[in-house]
A protein has these predicted regions:
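Conserved CoA-thioester-binding segment of acyl-CoA-metabolizing enzymes
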Residues: 1-54, 97
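Short, flexible helix-coil linker/hinge segments at the edges of structured domains or between repeats
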Residues: 81-84, 129-133, 137-158, 199
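Glycine-rich phosphate-binding loop at the start of an alpha helix
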Residues: 86-89, 93, 116, 172, ...
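Glycine-rich beta-to-alpha active-site loop
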Residues: 99-143, 166, 170-171, 175, ...
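Contiguous mid-protein beta-loop-alpha structural module that forms a pocket-lining wall or clamp
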Residues: 150-210
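Amphipathic alpha-helical blocks and their helix-capping loop/short-beta junctions
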Residues: 183, 189-273
Length: 285
């Protein structure tokens, strides 16, 4: 059985490879524990200049926490509340905080699905590199939760309407919109991600400026064809820039008469979410 997460050291670079491509590299509790352990060691090691995190395969960086496996383990552990369920989230959030405060360059190569827990282990780092394959979402309201892993904080830095839309609907956006919203730092074509990794290993940069220089040499502008915001930003802000879920529902209802296909689809999505999750999610934005 292959390791769920692989740790390697090459020329002063600590490399984390999420290695569950058949499960879209979804995080398990042992993976979280191991990443925490290695980051603690690498942060103080004189032999490690920076860290790279990536996902195995060409489809997904990390599609989130493996909630199916977690639920099964929690039930086997005796049902909620359990030490396992509490420990998983505590350690996961500790990991997210550690990445956001990591004292060395932390480079996230999010070349594929980056959702939920995958956002938490990547987008708090100093360098977040997306490609045309990147697909971002915080879909927690669909399972009765709320955007966690620091995702609520990230979305809370955006325009209120945009942050609320992403949080409540769990909307998916790609690289152009991520760059526009400053949720990523760089865009590199997927065909160049391998070269970027080789250049980083060869140079072994120890400062953010040096990392920037290397990434910039391969970076380009993302294609706008997949943008949701170019054509829908204004109506999203009109519908979602409110303080309560009731106000958002009322506004979506009133705007539905104009027959905007995009907004009506977002409203239908909202209707299927947990009301409690929606209220908590909006409160944290």
């Amino acid at each position: 059985m292959s390791e769920e997460v692989i740790f390697t050291e090459e020329n002063g670079i600590g490399i984390i490879t999420l290695n569950r491509p058949d499960r879209l590299n979804a995080l398990t509790y042992p993976m979280v524990q191991k990443i925490n352990k290695y980051l603690n060691s690498w942060e103080i090691s004189e032999h490690i200049n920076c860290v790279i995190i990536e996902g195995a395969g060409d489809k997904s960086f990390c599609a989130g926490g493996d909630v199916i496996k977690l639920r099964k383990e929690v039930l086997e552990d005796g049902g909620p509340p359990t030490n396992l369920s509490q420990s998983f989230f505590y350690d996961e959030y500790t990991l997210n905080f550690k990445i956001s405060n990591f004292k060395k360059p932390f480079i996230s190569l999010i070349n594929g699905y980056t959702m939920g827990g995958g956002v938490g282990v990547s987008m708090h780092g100093s360098h977040v590199v997306a490609s045309e394959k990147t697909m971002f979402a915080m879909p927690e309201t669909a399972i009765g939760l709320f955007p966690d892993v620091g995702g609520g904080w990230l979305l809370g830095q955006l325009d209120k309407g945009i942050g609320a839309w992403l949080s409540l609907v769990g909307a998916r956006i790609k690289a152009y919109d991520l760059m526009k919203l400053k949720l990523i730092t760089h865009y590199v074509s997927s065909s160049e991600i391998g070269n970027l990794k080789k250049m980083l290993i060869s140079s072994s940069p120890s400062t953010n400026d040096k990392v920037d220089s290397i990434i910039n040499s391969l970076s380009s502008n993302p294609n706008s064809e997949d943008s949701v915001l170019i054509t829908n930003e204004n109506i999203i802000k009109d519908a979602f820039s409110f303080d309560t879920i009731e106000q958002i529902f009322e506004k979506c209802e009133s705007l539905s008469i104009i027959g905007n296909e995009f907004l009506n689809a977002q409203f239908e999505e909202l209707k299927h979410k947990s009301p409690t999750s929606l209220k908590i999610s909006l409160k944290q934005i």
